[in-house]
Amino acid sequence: MIQVLLVTICLAVFPYQGSSIILGSGNVNDYEVVYPRKVTALPKGAAQPKYEDTMQYEFKVNGEPVVLHLEKNKGLFSEDYSETHYSPDGREITTYPPVEDHCYYHGRIQNDADSTASISACNGLKGHFKLQGEMYLIEPLELSDSEAHAVFKYENVEKEDEAPKMCGVTQNWESYEPIKKASQLNLTPEQQRYLNTKKYIELVIVADNVMVKKYTSNSTAIRTRIYACVNTLNLIYRAFNIHIALVGIEIWSNGDLINVTSAANVTLDLFGNWRRRVLLRHKRHDNAQLLTAIDFDGPTVGLAYGASMCDPRFATGIVQDHSKLDIMVAVTMAHELGHNLGMNHDGNQCNCGGNPCIMSATLNFEPAYQFSDCSRDEHWRYLIDNRPPCILNKPSITDIVSPPVCGNYFVEVGEECDCGLPARCQNPCCNAATCKLRPGTQCEDGECCEQCQFKGAGTECRAASSECDIAESCTGQSADCPTDDFQRNGQPCLNNNGYCYNGTCPTLDDQCISFFGSSKTVAPDVCFNLNLQGQGDFYCRRENTRIFPCAPQDKKCGRLFCVLGPTGNTISCQSTYSQSDLDIGMVDLGTKCGDGRVCNSTRQCVDVNTAY
């Protein structure tokens, strides 16, 4: 990485102190006008790219000179990043725009070890930076002098609405009383290595039709809003060694694809179902958030499912576009994603070093930028107990023509490792100045990396989760654990009570226990005869509003029926259903429906040898 030696600092113009102004961020009561001067790091005669990989700007804050170092967030977009919108006649249009030469940066202030920055350099400098423990915002001024910018503290932005804003989550999903600190978890070496392994979340953001109307159908403005928020989201989650890669956005330009309502819990339920049934079928991703301009009921500005990362339906959240400031919406995104990752709301005992905490139930008027000690411990406990598999899959790295940025924590083309800037790197395996492995080392991190060396071939790196799963072992040639694999579909399991399906052993009894509790068992055949009628909620298939009854041999592949143990001469057939998710209460695919037979995707009971 090219180092720039600043011999003298020459500011173009002395800053101007202003009292009040209307900016894109809102009404600002106290601000400075500054003229950031770019210090080029390019050698003389070198070609000037539109957006350089690294940049430095000089300006004054409170009369004191500062140097802002910026590095392009190369990992912001995945290789298969896509954008989807809808034509006036309802046709789905998906494009794959080039995003390598984007204008979104992370950074720091020179000589301030605790500083951070999230900046868009698309049209001037817009974003925020932390300087000497205080949060500042910067954005261009719409003046004839195009170099003029306003710098101001967040506290000087007039609040649009003084009413409190809150997350809609009202209960915890795990009860650890008291919360065990990380030091009290008695982690095994394997668990500690797992926690230290870099995680990746491939994210899709969906903008609803109210967003389209709010931004007057300006898709560029919507994209810019999303990009800026995810750039900040990425910076926030660096504290957990998690990289957020935006793999796609979808804009409901021709109307909402679900009923987006002011009742946040209803909207979240509908969005989760739509994501599972529709979005996942045409876009691979780990997590999805709905960004809406609708005003949720009460003080709610966001809602998410808890401890649900990688789940097809529940790895979702909804966020209200409630502030003009990108950082405030980004913090709400980070909060809801935190719920997916096992974090509860912070209690009075939780500490952020005197700063606002991201997982506070109430959104502070000052933007939170840190997770509390409680959030850290809850997140680690969730990871250890649940091992969500999707976050270990590294997204594809764009084949970038321009040189990679050494020091941005993201391993890019030509790099062997990247542990951040030399002043912050704490990894003994990596040379932070060159992003190459140190002599004699083989790896930086990974489930098959220990003390900078590949683990020996045959060392187990992922235990089998069930008899239908397969334990993975290191190859001795890579730091990564091989792709998660499982026993062949159709292999008998649970003493021939089921057949393996995608690493699990689905049975009717287990599904009854899941829905109704441990005292329930599968109902007798007479209950399943209701599926032969094809009426109401009892059927095998449904196409739009038309339902199809089960054939006699397929009746145990339709609606699931359960009973509460022996009940004398009376049989009470119990079933469940959901109007918002028609698959709930149906027999799971791959379930045994007879000797040597399983339910297939069309809910037919077929020979297990031909089912897969």
UniProtKB/Swiss-Prot annotation:
Sequence ranges assigned to domain Disintegrin in this UniProt record: 403-489
Signal sequence bounds: 1-20
Cofactor: Zn(2+)
Sugar-bearing residue positions: 218, 502
Residues reported to bind Ca(2+) 2: 405, 408, 410, 412, 415, 418
Pfam families in the cross-refs: ADAM_CR (PF08516), Disintegrin (PF00200), Pep_M12B_propep (PF01562), Reprolysin (PF01421)
Superkingdom in the source lineage: Eukaryota
Motif position, D/ECD-tripeptide: 467-469
GO molecular function annotations of the record: metal ion binding; metalloendopeptidase activity; toxin activity
Active site per database record: 336
Binding site for Ca(2+) 1: 202, 286, 390, 393
Compartment(s) where it occurs, according to its Swiss-Prot or TrEMBL record: Secreted
Note: The disintegrin domain belongs to the long disintegrin subfamily.
Protein family per UniProt: Belongs to the venom metalloproteinase (M12B) family. P-III subfamily.
Annotated protein name in UniProt: Zinc metalloproteinase-disintegrin-like 8
Source organism of the structure: Crotalus adamanteus
